[in-house]
């Protein structure tokens, strides 16, 4: 091939070949072409002279054609041909690139734009000529078109940025709403609380929320005075009684009668009460008397609805109270309670005062003192009878039963009891609602299991000097002439036997209904016949009231102060006692939001999602960040992230509390607890969900910005002096900005009730339904057919429009993957031997080994 070129044509060397290929690359550029099509192999870095000679041999036919083409071009003024077009495109594209770099900040590009790299060289022209371009040559190229779009887009971007900065600067004084702040505040007197009780293994009062008893958050908050849990004592007591006896009311009524109860002076001054007494079948009340009604079960009261309890003694937060013993009926002994004998301190007229009618004794400074007093009772069978061994199929074993000579209902169930201490009782001469006449006390007694008797507990009543005259008192002390339904002074001496009996019934007033509980059948179930004994099993912390007593100046026949300290019979009122036990628990809540200045956004933590489990953490570990008045507002914001990060720790504490309390609660009730708290958190959000979203605040945000027009309309101005750049406690800030919280509440209510956008949206939806209502009349199969046709047509249209771009994209991707770059496409004569396209793959010629190329 070299000999042919030498004979007929002038051989083209490496230098001339380099210039010819430069010209060829320039002429290949057209309106749609790239800026640098292909690579000049003679300008590849590190190319050697041997390589250049080899390239000349391979590309000699193409080089000859390029030289002939250049010689045929007539270079005249105003007609530069392809070369002029190439130069115009090159330098016009460079101008566009210069403008683009200018807008994005690369000003130095204009200074150094001639130093673009080793592959950029000016193409030498034999004769300089004036650069003149026709309108056709200066037509809009793709690069110029996209350059204009880039210019417009860049200008729009800068304009939007300017507008955004202006809006931001205009709202720098906006208000920020802090949702679910780590703070607890007292509830209002008018707020409604929802509570439940919890007692281990107690079906009548068992609630999953009671697992929070041992989960308390130690905190240094100091809360202002607010309503205590004792304010709801009457409601709680009534509900507790209904819970304790709810399954008993489903049984049949045993007896019913009407009765009139007289007051202290007969029926004068309308002091008589007409009551309807109902005696239910009492067998189902058997366990209730021994547990709930006598206060033998530890009961914890738990709050729901997102509210918590603050123990003012221990300075702790919890969902439930400490275990309490709440006797539901009047009982001689009670748990660790106190009584406000100064009646002026009790404002609730529904709570009976401590004291009775017609007394001159005035008790004050009462305190509860525990005692180790014990009662011992023994029973001796007073009627003849025999023990009979019977076979019971339902017990699967033999048993002994006592068969008296008379019916058991006619047998007097009498016992003899004594006390280990001298006890002076201030007693009433009659029981509640005319139940029992005479002075009496009552206590619980436990009987151990023996050969003939089962284990059982009884309620025993001891009386003195039972008489028949209801108008006069049966005295048992030194007060001989006390008349009417008055208290008496009686003393039960230590180690002295007194006649007592099993209590076979009592009367209780529940709401407006007075119920008499008959225990005769229940007592018979315990096999009370025969000889047996029992011992009182009062808890160690039970005792009596020790009071200072002062007599009045009246000389009437009324009860005076006891000569010795002692137990005060009938002092305990279940409502008053429950209220006294709950006075130390203050009902608090976590605010749903608090209004703070925009300044908090400058030092707040990185935004976190307010997920449901995060809300659970905030409600249980408020103290981690020092909730309340113990830390400044700026410190609370910076430590808020730590509170959110410890939600797993809160769940671990819940599990640990469940394990300590009862192992069986770890599975199901733990899940129920978490579900319950999640429901509370969801309800708290859904209550104002629509309004908060209208304000641009969703459930995933803790800090939400109020639109400026709203807080200006409602005159929500902050006192920056009080805020003091966050150097104020959250508790103080909340108390001094309650008006802001109220105004924000008004905003929410206005949005919820009078939402204009919501009404417009509904109207638009209705209009759209009117216009598009005809679609509903089209049969279902026609709808499917029409939808299929529209879908196919849309797909074909997209395919036609996007097919060229898709093919070009696939071609470019394949070239990139294979690593090929097209250098030249030489024209081959028909007579000449077929020559393959010269390609280079990664710097190597196709079809040649690496050794041959070297």
Curated annotation (Swiss-Prot):
For this protein's source organism, the top of the classification is: Viruses, Riboviria, Pararnavirae, Artverviricota, Revtraviricetes
Q: Which residues are glycosylated?
A: 220, 258, 269, 274, 298, 330, 336, 342, 418, 422, 448, 469, 481, 499, 518, 531, 548, 551, 715, 719, 727, 735
Q: MF terms per GO, please?
A: structural molecule activity
> Which terms in the GO cellular component ontology are assigned?
host cell plasma membrane; membrane; viral envelope; virion membrane
- All ranges on the Cytoplasmic side of the membrane: 805-854
Describe the processing and modification events after translation.
Specific enzymatic cleavages in vivo yield mature proteins. Envelope glycoproteins are synthesized as an inactive precursor that is N-glycosylated and processed likely by host cell furin or by a furin-like protease in the Golgi to yield the mature SU and TM proteins. The cleavage site between SU and TM requires the minimal sequence [KR]-X-[KR]-R.
Q: Which residues form a coiled coil?
A: 641-691, 734-770
Region annotated Immunosuppression sits at 660-678
Q: What is this protein called?
A: Envelope glycoprotein gp150
According to the record, the segments passing through the membrane are: 784-804
Check the record and name the InterPro entries matching this protein: Envelope_glycop_lentivirus (IPR018582), GP41-like (IPR000328)
Residues the record marks as site: Cleavage: 609-610
């Amino acid at each position: 091939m070299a000999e042919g070129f030498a004979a007929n044509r002038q051989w083209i060397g490496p230098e001339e070949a380099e210039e010819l290929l430069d010209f060829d690359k320039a002429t290949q550029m057209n309106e749609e072409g790239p800026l640098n099509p292909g690579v000049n192999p003679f300008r590849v870095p590190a190319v050697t002279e041997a390589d250049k000679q080899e390239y000349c041999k391979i590309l000699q036919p193409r080089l000859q054609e390029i030289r002939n083409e250049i010689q045929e071009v007539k270079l005249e003024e105003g007609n530069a041909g392809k070369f002029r077009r190439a130069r115009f495109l090159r330098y016009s594209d460079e101008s566009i690139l210069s403008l683009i770099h200018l807008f994005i900040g690369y000003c130095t590009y204009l200074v150094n734009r001639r130093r673009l790299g080793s592959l950029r060289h000016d193409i030498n022209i034999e004769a300089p000529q004036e650069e003149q371009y026709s309108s056709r040559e200066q037509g809009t190229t793709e690069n110029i078109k996209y350059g204009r779009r880039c210019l417009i887009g860049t200008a729009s971007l800068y304009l939007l940025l300017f507008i955004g900065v202006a809006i931001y600067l205009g709202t720098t004084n906006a208000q920020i709403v802090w949702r679910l702040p780590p703070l607890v505040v007292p509830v209002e007197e008018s707020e409604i609380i929802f509570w439940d009780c919890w007692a281990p293994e107690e079906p009548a009062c068992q609630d999953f929320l009671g697992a929070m008893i041992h989960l308390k958050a130690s905190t240094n908050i100091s809360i202002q005075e607010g309503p205590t849990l004792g304010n709801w004592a009457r409601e709680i007591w009534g509900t507790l009684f209904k819970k304790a006896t709810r399954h008993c009311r489903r049984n049949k009524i045993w007896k019913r009668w009407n009765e009139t109860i007289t007051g202290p002076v007969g029926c004068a001054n309308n002091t008589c009460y007409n009551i309807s007494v109902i005696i239910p079948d009492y067998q189902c009340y058997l366990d209730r008397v021994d547990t709930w009604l006598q206060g033998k079960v530890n009961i914890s009261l738990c709050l729901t609805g997102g509210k918590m309890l603050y123990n003012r003694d221990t300075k702790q937060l919890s969902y439930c109270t400490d275990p309490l013993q709440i006797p539901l009926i009047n009982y001689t002994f009670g748990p660790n309670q106190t009584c406000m004998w100064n009646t002026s301190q009790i404002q609730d007229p529904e709570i009976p005062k401590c004291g009775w009618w017609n007394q001159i004794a005035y008790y004050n400074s009462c305190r509860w003192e525990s005692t180790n007093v014990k009662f011992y009772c023994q029973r001796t069978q007073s009627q003849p009878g025999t023990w009979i061994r019977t076979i019971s199929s339902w017990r699967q074993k033999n048993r002994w039963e006592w068969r008296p000579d008379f019916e058991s209902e006619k047998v007097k169930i009498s016992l003899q009891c004594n006390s280990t201490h001298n006890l002076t009782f201030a007693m009433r001469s009659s029981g509640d609602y005319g139940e029992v006449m005479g002075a009496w006390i009552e206590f619980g007694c436990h009987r151990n299991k023996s050969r003939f008797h089962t284990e059982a507990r009884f309620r025993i009543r001891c009386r003195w000097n039972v008489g028949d005259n209801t108008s006069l008192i049966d005295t048992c002390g030194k007060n001989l002439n006390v008349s009417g339904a008055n208290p008496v002074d009686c003393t039960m001496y230590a180690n002295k036997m007194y006649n007592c009996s099993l209590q076979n019934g009592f009367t209780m007033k529940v709401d407006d209904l007075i119920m008499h509980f008959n225990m005769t059948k229940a007592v018979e179930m315990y096999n009370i016949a025969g000889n047996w004994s029992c011992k009182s099993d009062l808890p160690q912390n039970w005792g009596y009231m020790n009071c200072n007593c002062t007599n009045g100046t009246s000389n009437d026949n009324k009860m005076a102060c006891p000569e010795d300290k002692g137990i005060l019979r009938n002092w305990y009122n279940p409502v008053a006692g429950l209220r006294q036990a709950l006075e130390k628990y203050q009902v608090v809540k976590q605010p749903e939001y608090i209004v703070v200045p925009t300044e908090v956004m400058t030092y707040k933590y990185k935004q976190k999602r307010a997920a449901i489990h995060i809300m659970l953490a905030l409600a249980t570990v408020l103290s981690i960040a020092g909730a309340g008045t113990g830390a400044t507002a700026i410190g609370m914001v910076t430590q808020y992230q730590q509170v959110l990060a410890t939600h797993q720790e809160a769940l671990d504490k819940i599990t640990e509390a469940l394990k300590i309390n009862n192992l069986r609660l770890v599975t199901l009730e733990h899940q129920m607890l978490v579900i319950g708290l999640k429901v509370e958190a969801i309800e708290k959000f859904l209550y104002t969900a629509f309004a908060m979203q209208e304000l641009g605040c969703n459930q995933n945000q803790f800090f939400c910005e109020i639109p400026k027009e709203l807080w200006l309309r409602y005159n929500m101005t902050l006192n920056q002096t009080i805020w003091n750049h966050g150097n104020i406690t959250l508790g103080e800030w909340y108390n001094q900005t309650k008006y802001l919280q109220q105004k924000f509440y008004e905003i929410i209510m206005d949005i919820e009730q009078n939402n204009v956008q919501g009404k417009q949206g509904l109207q638009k939806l209705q209009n759209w339904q009117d216009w598009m209502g005809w679609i509903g009349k089209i049969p279902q199969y026609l709808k499917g057919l029409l939808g299929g046709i529209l879908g196919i047509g849309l797909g074909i249209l997209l395919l036609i429009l996007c097919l060229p771009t898709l093919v070009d994209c696939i071609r470019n991707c394949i070239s990139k993957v294979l690593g090929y770059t097209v250098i030249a496409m030489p024209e081959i004569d028909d007579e000449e031997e077929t020559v393959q396209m010269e390609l280079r793959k990664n710097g190597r010629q196709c079809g040649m080994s690496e050794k041959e190329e070297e």
